[in-house]
Amino acid sequence: MEYYNVGKIVNTHGVRGEVRVLATTDFIDERFAKGNTLYLQQSGEPLPLTIESTRQHKGFVLVKFVGYDNINDVEQFRDHELMVSADDQQPLDDGQYYYHQIIGLDVETTDGRHLGKIKEILSPGANDVWVVERPEKRDLLLPVIDEVVKNVDLDKNFVTVELMEGLE
């Protein structure tokens, strides 16, 4: 089964078994909802953890898992990734994509020039920014806006962009 990262446990919180999670998903309310199962990446098989409660606190998501009732139970989870199974991913609207679908796509301009591959996605504020790794040049930062991104073709594994003045 495939799993996708939705956050990282960065620390424990309090003594009653809560963990502090740095979320890496755009769907915080859905992913960290009571009753959902997340998987802890560890050596061997991912460990399924059912969410008992969740709340926001100072930019983090505080999560309590069923059956883990004190700090000693969850201390071992620190610095581990939390994942969701591919089966649990919600279908997205047209024109919306999961990060794992975008990373690795080839990038071409509207006139057919190959620019490189998307290696990372940044979320600095108003819109995402795709980091395009280019051979023998520094990385290109592409804002994900309609004026720049013209087409995403997941079947053919490429994105068509129109470079605005000053981007390259």
Curated annotation (Swiss-Prot):
Molecular functions (GO terms)? ribosome binding
Question: Which keywords does this chain's UniProt record carry?
Answer: Chaperone, Cytoplasm, Ribosome biogenesis, rRNA processing
Compartments (UniProt record): Cytoplasm
- The PRC barrel domain sits at 94-167
Name the predominant localization. cytoplasm
Q: Name one Pfam family in it.
A: PRC
Which GO BP terms, alphabetically? Answer: ribosomal small subunit biogenesis; rRNA processing
Q: Which domain of life is it from?
A: Bacteria
| Domain free text | The PRC barrel domain binds ribosomal protein uS19.
What family does the entry list?
A: Belongs to the RimM family.
Q: What is this protein called?
A: Ribosome maturation factor RimM
Q: Which gene encodes it?
A: rimM
